[in-house]
Amino acid sequence: MIPVSLTSQLANAADTEINRILRIGATACKQSKPTGEVGFVAAFVLGAVPAIAAAWRPILSPAGYSVSMTGIFCHQTPRATFTNSAGLTKSCELSDLLVVVDDMTSGVPTSRWAVLIQAKMAASHGGQSLSGAGDLTQLDLMTHWPAFSLPSTFPPGARNFSTCSYSGTNLDCGRYGLIEPQPTPLWHQQAPAPKMPAGGDELGTFLAKMLESGQTGYGREATGRFDDWSRTVDDLMNVTAKTAFTYSAGLKGPHPRGNTAIALVVCNPSGSDFTNGYWM
């Protein structure tokens, strides 16, 4: 996607905007200061996605690059049903957030990277340990990614991320986002584990590294439509992103679950429309 020489600038710009939005909320949507993980995810989708695109534009434009970013509020929608490592049928949300970046440099999307993120408030020391039954079910899903199904509003059939042949591993498809409380709600990314340490890449840095050409470990490529990872990302953009959510704690709704912003406005010479990451 983007040369590594631009990563530092993109990371600093994204971290600055995310930190600002998490402190104050998505004020353009009349969100008050968020205090819990759901509110922080909403602030990212509604406020940080367009703010990052605006901050990246003067970095990418002179170099001739263009990317689009989509954030999708997935909290409780959809839920995944799977057989856990103990052989029991379990159900939990697929994640709290999906972030997708598309390379739009040529005017049409040529490559796509995505990551599912489960948000958790960090403990006082900055890390987090998972021990509750619900948390362990979610961890089992994100650690092993067994075959799972989604509700009837999605195309039928089991989904198995092992069908993805792109570089990286199934573990790269998901990360935990550990968010520190106000007044400095820093958001750090951690690989799924029962005990996650403090620190790690800030979310903006993680997203900037997703754009690096040839990288692994920061999300996973989802360019195709024939493997279950790419298909699931596409389905979330076509189904979940088109629905609305309400959140009573400081955010009047409803609001769209999906929000897309382009870091460099490009002209499509064919005159067709850009819809959910694809020219139609």
Annotate each language-model stretch with its function.
Residues 15-83:
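Acidic-basic catalytic patches of nuclease active cores, encompassing PD-(D/E)XK
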Residues 100-102:
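Beta-propeller blade termini
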Residues 3-21:
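Soluble secreted/lumenal catalytic domains
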